[in-house]
Amino acid sequence: MKRLLMCAGVLIAATCSLSAQQNPPASPPETAMGKIAGKAITITYNSPRVKGREGHVFTSDGLIKTAHGSQYPIWRAGANAATTLMTDGNLTIGDLVVPAGKYTLFVDISDPDNWTLIVNKKTGEWGLAYDGSQDLGRTKMKMSKPAAMVEDLVWTIGDGKITLAWENHAASVSVH
């Protein structure tokens, strides 16, 4: 009987462990990597999903609605921890000169038709801890509408630009 109970306990523990591992995180960590002008670029972010909120992720004035009801004109451009950019060489992003290094990316979405990429020198922050005094600078992004709704937020690097797409929005900026 003792042996049977022990086997049952091991089986239950294994089953619980397996079922706990089957639930993916709500906003999984993602990495976009690429080379532009021979310089390696990596963007690390967490990718939220639209999850049935199409048309309700962004308000009419461009502010993102958060789960706890707050609205932020400066967005971490992802979920959870702040989005980071690393490069092994000096870049020009839009009209902003960015020396080699690691930075935090934010996006000013206060105007729904004209987003602005913010490159911030302070790294290791939670996404809502924006400090404008640490900005390296800002540059305008080119807005477009994706061909289809983008369920999972995605950053891409290639074709001489960095692009952010989510829901019915896409914004890109040239890099060289």
Named regions from a protein language model:
Residues 4-14:
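Sec-dependent N-terminal signal peptides
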Residues 16-20:
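Sec/Tat signal peptide C-region and signal peptidase I cleavage site
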Residues 21-99, 104-176:
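Targeting-peptide/extracellular-domain and disordered-appendage signature
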